[in-house]
Amino acid sequence: MNKLEERSQHRKSRFRFLVISTFWRVLLLLKNDAEPLFHLGNIHYAYGHKASAMNYWKEAVSKNREHEKAWHNLVQCAVIQEEWEQAAEGLTILCRNHPTRFEYMSLYTHALKKLGKKEELEEWYLSHINGPHHEWAIEGLGMLYIRTRREIDAFKLLSPFVRKFPNRPVGLKILGISSIRTNQYEAGLTFLEKSLELKEDKEVKSLVDRVKRLKKVRGGNR
């Protein structure tokens, strides 16, 4: 995401802070709309007052739900403060207004993960599997299926995907894990080794080593 609209050019003097904030407070009395609140949030953030900055941006978006710069800043500050409910609320607005902007999509995904909202996360990925970022959505959904022990769903989703995109390490990783969990060890090992060739991954390497050890044990018991 772009940096916060923090007006970093303001020098960190108490006097300057008072002058600028007073200007916007007077304008707020005259206009009583979102714009002075937005700028008050900016100046407070620039001088390190994150809590009051967030409050001003919240007031700004309560007056104008379509004030994108205020939402943008509020979301970034909420992420920094790890206030994920607030971040998710703002990102629903930003994603609605910019449905193909990947930085908002991926950050909203991160917020849903932090909140543990698995059903909403599944719906979110499903809503994008036919869009411009379908590779990301399919791999994200597949990984969600793996994490929630839905290996068969992951296998069905990733099998045609890997045939179409055979050189994507994450897709190969998901298909490899789902194959192993459904007792297709040889196929799973092949997918995981191919994934590892394309991208170093400690989890994949650990799985490959584990499957190879299991094969040796089984071979020795014959």
UniProtKB/Swiss-Prot annotation:
Disulfide bridge partners, by residue number: none
The TPR repeat ranges on this chain: 34-67, 169-202
InterPro entries, A to Z: TPR-like_helical_dom_sf, TPR_rpt
Record keywords, A-Z: Repeat, TPR repeat
Gene3D superfamilies named among the record's database cross-references: Tetratricopeptide repeat domain (1.25.40.10)
Protein name, as recorded: TPR repeat-containing protein BH2049
